[in-house]
Amino acid sequence: KLLMWEICKNKTDSYKEFDRTVDYIYDTINAYKMLDRKSAKFDKEGGIHAHIRRGPLGIILCLGPYNYPLNETFCLLIPAIIMGNTTIFKPAKHGVLLIAPLLKAFKESFPPGVVNILFGRGRKIATPIMKTGYIDVLALIGHSSSAVSLQDEHPNKNRLRLVLGLEAKNPGIILPDADLDHTIKECISGTLSYNGQRCTALKVLYVHESIVNEFNKKFS
């Protein structure tokens, strides 16, 4: 309901986002368990023996988008926490109401200082944080201009690690043997779901010339 009321996402898509987020959390935990089994190992190279062990990267600034404020943000936040990092988590300007029920869960599940949540406009909050130079990883889902701008604010951007999900011209390719009725349905959903306000929305459709007229007729 919080997704529906604040960002006008329909009920079906809101349920899908919640379920997909829960699945992602479990999948991430399972992936970490597999990774942890190999996190410490002895290796030999050039006559030199080494004990190799993975470790946290440090402080991660997580900036999520408004259109998928639960799923996309948690795709950044959950791996960062599970791998032992501390996080500064700033939700998007819109889509923040759903964070309120999660505050208690974060407080009870993690030590103080592991998950730090700030609310407000990104430019006013993220920019001064980046200028401190304390951020080790910038994890952002948004526009490339925002990523470049924030990266430039870091005094040592050459050592700043980036985890980015940016805009793209996502193509749909329709071949001659495609089931047009099903394809049209998927293309409309892919382009117009949530009014097309998705980084994964279809932006360009490439249709084989042998079926383009029939496709356009049905698509329109």
Spans of features found by a protein language model:
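N-terminal Rossmann-like NAD(P)+-binding subdomain of aldehyde/semialdehyde dehydrogenases
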Residues: 1-49
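Conserved small-residue-rich beta-alpha loop and adjacent elements
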Residues: 38-113
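A structured beta-alpha segment of the ubiquitous adenosine-cofactor-binding alpha/beta core
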Residues: 49-50, 117-136
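Generic hydrophobic/aromatic pocket-lining and core-packing "Φ" positions
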Residues: 77-78, 126, 184
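Periplasmic-binding protein-like
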Residues: 78, 136-141
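General beta-strand structural signal in soluble alpha/beta enzymes
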Residues: 89, 117-119, 140-142, 162-166
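ALDH superfamily catalytic-core signature
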Residues: 109-110, 137, 145-220
